[in-house]
Amino acid sequence: MKEIINKFVGLSGYQIKRVKYLYDPFQNLIKSINYFNVKSIVDVGANKGQFVNKLLKNGFKGNILSFEPLFDEHNYLKKISKKKNKWTIEERCALGKKNSNEKIYVSGNSESSSLLKILPKHTDIRPDSKIVDTQEINVKKLNNFKNKIYKLEKNILLKIDCQGSEMDVLIGANKIIKSFSCIFLEVSLVNLYQKQKLWLEIIKYLKKINFEVW
């Protein structure tokens, strides 16, 4: 069958070959950080510091400001960041489009926790993401932290990984969004959380505020 397909495709001057899987999303991010000469990172949804630790292992030496809403994870971050003089853990809070008091749904795997209720589509694929607890949390706009962000060395990357609330974080950063040279965020093709905004709506919003897909 491969020979038949190759003969057919070969009529157009192309050939299909098996190649090793070379694409590494994180290495692509590192290359982008270097390309944009990123000196500081605002890390929204730090969880247990997985993202930052990978950055540090890949040689990033700039300032990092991390936000994490979960109680245990926030305490853990404060502990491990003490050895990193350029890594600051901000007060325990969630980030959103308005200042409020909310309930965060805590998943069994921690990293799937969200201000939005998780849908069966998610838990069917990852049973460890089921809600096991809730916590009361202050939700604040990223705008509230403008003075700290303005002090960061430019260029600044904004990283958002908050399980369905990415659009709300962007809206809550509307007054300082021009401070960021680039934005790295997780988007979803399908609804995994109630009321979450999907990839196309987020991309349209980013284009509206003069960012483009890289």
What are the residue ranges of the model-derived segments?
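A short helix-to-beta-strand connector/capping loop
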Residues: 83-89, 132-133, 153-154
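Glycine-rich adenosyl-binding loop in Rossmann-like folds that engage adenosine-containing cofactors
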Residues: 96-140, 144
